[in-house]
């Protein structure tokens, strides 16, 4: 079989399909996407079956915007005997290379939520069976492939694998985060997820550390500011609205009632710039580029709101515009973009300069 299975946000299947089709063709890998609206996944069928594994290894997952997880599908099992689902799975995957982790998953849809509890319960016996047949390591092994069982119904599933060096580390491609009780809004989770997805965990003490100065444009009521404050940063919140009093009481927040597109810092001591303003993407992109051009920040996280149509094309266009603007400043900028779980009709973009980050590392 050897197709690709791609998880995405329900309602964004066409964007995921357009993205994988374009990115695969850039690698001379051709096929077509099978799309079912609001399903939360896309199946990409390749004309050359061997190319599914090639894409899973070589197409950089971190560069994909609308795709939450990418794996090779080797088998589709239908009409399983619910009294014994494990035997057909073992038989189908008997020639798999030994895997280091197991993920029993389903789509991120309301309809599939009923399957989630089943998937959790089924994981334990399947894990035991795979280990007994030496298809899964005795302990979780990060450097081995990941075994995926993707249930579409309790008697229907896709079997496959992903590479741990080129996949999402999260179950279903979704970080499991809880909204802090003192957060002014659930948008706080959006920035927290962005940190998990874009900033390597081993660099948090370097790039997300106490004492850093940060700016939050369009801050009110303070969801994103809350994430910066809880990491010990000193934050300038720029917004004409009202900030949550709980944040002001920390003593770490200075609230300026001003236009986020106009205000600029008087000192060159800002490390993080974050922005979640509802505005046309083109305007946001040019503003972000201006901040880096003037050396007003060292690293940025911001959202780009998407139109109702041509969302993939719009996202790619704005990222390429930003890339061009930043190249005029320095060739060392890195741009990452993702539609996060906590994003809706938007994507989150992360920008940093490799040279500036290396200087932080040198100080350590």
Curated annotation (Swiss-Prot):
Keyword set includes S-adenosyl-L-methionine: yes
Record localization: Cytoplasm
Main location: cytoplasm
Domain of life, per lineage: Bacteria
Reaction(s) the record says it catalyses: cytidine(2498) in 23S rRNA + S-adenosyl-L-methionine = 2'-O-methylcytidine(2498) in 23S rRNA + S-adenosyl-L-homocysteine + H(+)
Keyword Methyltransferase: yes
EC code: 2.1.1.186
Active site (record annotation): 305 (proton acceptor)
CC annotations in GO: cytoplasm
Swiss-Prot/TrEMBL GO biological process terms: methylation; rRNA processing
Keywords: Cytoplasm, Methyltransferase, rRNA processing, S-adenosyl-L-methionine, Transferase
Subunit structure of this chain's protein: Monomer.
HAMAP family recorded: 23SrRNA_methyltr_M (MF_01551)
Function according to Swiss-Prot or TrEMBL: Catalyzes the 2'-O-methylation at nucleotide C2498 in 23S rRNA.
PANTHER family listed in its UniProt record: RIBOSOMAL RNA LARGE SUBUNIT METHYLTRANSFERASE M (PTHR37524), RIBOSOMAL RNA METHYLTRANSFERASE FTSJ DOMAIN-CONTAINING PROTEIN (PTHR37524:SF2)
Entry's family note: Belongs to the class I-like SAM-binding methyltransferase superfamily. RNA methyltransferase RlmE family. RlmM subfamily.
Name of this protein: Ribosomal RNA large subunit methyltransferase M
Native source organism of the sequence: Aeromonas salmonicida (strain A449)
């Amino acid at each position: 079989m050897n197709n690709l299975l791609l998880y995405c946000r329900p309602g964004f299947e066409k964007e995921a399909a357009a993205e994988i089709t374009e990115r695969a063709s850039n690698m001379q890998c051709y096929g077509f996407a099978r799309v079912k609206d609001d399903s939360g996944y896309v199946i990409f069928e390749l004309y050359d079956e061997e190319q599914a594994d090639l894409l899973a290894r070589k197409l950089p997952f971190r560069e994909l915007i609308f795709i939450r997880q990418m794996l090779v599908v080797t088998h589709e099992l239908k009409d399983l005997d619910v009294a014994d689902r494990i035997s057909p799975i073992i038989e189908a995957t008997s020639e798999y290379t030994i895997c280091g982790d197991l993920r029993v998953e389903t789509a991120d849809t309301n309809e599939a939520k009923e399957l989630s509890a089943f998937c959790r319960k089924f994981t334990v016996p399947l894990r035991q069976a795979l280990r007994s047949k030496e298809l899964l390591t005795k302990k979780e092994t990060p450097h081995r492939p990941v075994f995926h069982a993707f249930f579409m119904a309790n008697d229907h599933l896709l079997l496959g694998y992903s590479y741990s060096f080129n996949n999402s580390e999260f179950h279903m491609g979704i970080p499991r985060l809880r909204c802090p009780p003192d957060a002014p809004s659930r948008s706080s989770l959006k920035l927290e997820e962005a940190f998990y997805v874009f900033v390597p965990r081993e660099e948090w003490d370097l790039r997300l550390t106490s004492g850093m100065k940060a700016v939050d444009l369009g801050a009110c009521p303070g969801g994103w500011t809350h994430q910066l404050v809880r990491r010990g940063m000193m934050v300038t919140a720029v917004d004409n609205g009202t900030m949550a009093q709980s944040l002001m009481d920390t003593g770490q927040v200075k609230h300026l009632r001003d236009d986020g597109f106009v205000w600029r810092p008087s000192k060159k001591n800002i490390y993080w710039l974050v922005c979640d303003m509802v505005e046309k993407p083109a305007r946001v992109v040019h503003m972000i580029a201006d901040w880096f051009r003037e050396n007003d920040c060292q690293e940025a996280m911001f959202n780009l709101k998407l139109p109702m149509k041509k969302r993939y094309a719009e996202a790619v266009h704005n990222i390429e515009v930003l890339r061009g603007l930043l190249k005029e400043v320095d060739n060392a900028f890195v741009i990452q973009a993702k539609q996060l779980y906590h994003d809706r009709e938007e994507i989150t973009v992360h920008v940093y300069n490799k040279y500036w980050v290396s200087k932080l590392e040198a100080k350590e």
